[in-house]
C-alpha cells in the first residue's frame, strides 16, 4: 500500500520544505554522498530560500510564492527530518545469522583472462545483514520456513527490516519475489496482511489463512523501506528513490549470500503505487552490476506512479466517468481540471527537463491540488472509485488499524527480533520528505527502455483505482519511447481469464512489455481480486505471458 493522499492538498503538502538540492542530471552518479550528511541541517525559511531561486521558471516560482503566502508560519518552522524512532539494537549474538558486507567485498576470483576481480560488484563494506529463524508455531502466520531481520548500513545508521516466507509449494525450485509497498512511506507488512501474504488479520486480532497468498508458488520477501518505515529505523533519513536503491541491492546481495539455496532460483521484484518509482530505479541498480548473485528475471508494477506527465492527464477522465465507472465530479469541476491541465503539464515538463527540486516540487504541489484535489474533497475513496472513504484515520481501510495493533504486540515483535518500540503502517514524514526533495515527479520511466532490453516488465492496474488509475497506466505504457513501442501499441487486446473461463481483465503484450487491466479491483489488486491476482502472478512467473 499506497500512494498516500496526504500530499494531495496544499495544506498537507506545505507542512515542510526541503533545502536546495543538486540537479539530478545523472542521479546514479550523484548519490555517492550519504543522504544523512547532505541533509543534516534544519530548513531555512522560504523567504531565505527565494534568494536561490533565480533559475526557476516563472510558473514554478509562482507556485512557491502561493504556498509561502498561504502557509507562512508552516514554512518558517518547517523541519526536514523527523525524530528517529526509539529503538534498542540487539547484539549480534541474539541473531541466528550475521553476514558482513566487508567479507563479501573482499572475495576475489580469477576471470577468464587470468585477472583478479571481485566476485560480486558493489560497495558493500558498510553493510551487514542479520537474520533469525521465525518459529511458525509461535505466530501462526504460516507453516512455512521463515526468516526475519535487518539490513544494516553501519556507516549511516540505517536499518531495514524484512520478513521472508518460503514457498508453500516447492521452495527448492520455486522463484523468489521481493514485494514493495508504496506511499512513499508505507510498510510492506501492510501488503503482507492486507493483500497478498499468507494471512489476514480481523478486528479482534485473529489471523486467517489466505489461500491466494503469493507464496503459494513462490518464496516472498516483504521489505520495509526506506528507513523509518514500519519496523525499519535510522538516526538519519532517506528521502529519495535513488538512495533507497543502493540499500535494496545490498540487502538482496547479502541475503542470497547467506541463503544460497534461494540464489539459484529466478528472482522477481513486484510492488504497487509508489513502487512505480522504486522498481525502475531498484532494477536499474541491480542490472548495473554485471557480477551479482541476484538472478533477476522480471519486474511487476501494480497501479504505479511512474510517468507523471502522462498519468496526470488521466485524473480528469477517471473522475468524470470515462474510466468505466460513474462520474464522481460534476461538469464544472471536470472543466476546471481541464483548464488546470496545461499548467500542470508545463510544470511537470520543466521538472523532466531539469530534474531539479526547484522545478519538481512546484509541479507536485500544483498538480496534486489541481488534478487530485477535487476528487479527494468529495470524500470518495481515492483508492477505489466505487465507494466512500470509510475510515480516514486509516487511509480509508479499518484493517490497517487492525494490522498496526497486531504488529505492535510485544510477543509479535519479540519473535520477529524487532528493534523499534512501535509500528505504524505509514510514515507521513517520509511521504512529505520525498515530495519536498522533488522525488514525486522525477522521470524514472526513462529507465524502463533499458530494463526492457534485458528482462520482461508487467504493468497491471485495478480498474477501480483513482489515484494511480488504469487509464494513466495504460497511457504511459503506450507513450513510452523504446524500440518495441510500435509493436506494443499495435498489439491486440486479449482477455485475461481463469482456468474456468471466468474473465478477470484484459491485457496486451509485445516483446518484453505487458499491460493488464484487472476488472473490479481498486488500488490494491491482490486484496480486491485475490484469485485473479494469484492466477496472473503464477502465469507470469511461469513464462512471462498472461
From Swiss-Prot:
One Pfam family of this chain: Peptidase_S10
Active-site residue list: 273, 465, 523
Prodomain positions: 18-132
GO molecular function terms listed in the Swiss-Prot or TrEMBL record: serine-type carboxypeptidase activity
E.C. designation(s): 3.4.16.5
Domain of life where this protein originates: Eukaryota
Enzyme class (EC, first level): hydrolase
Glycan attachment positions: 217, 512
Reactions catalysed according to its record: Release of a C-terminal amino acid with broad specificity
Described function: Vacuolar carboxypeptidase involved in degradation of small peptides. Digests preferentially peptides containing an aliphatic or hydrophobic residue in P1' position, as well as methionine, leucine or phenylalanine in P1 position of ester substrate.
Name of the protein in its database record: Carboxypeptidase Y homolog A
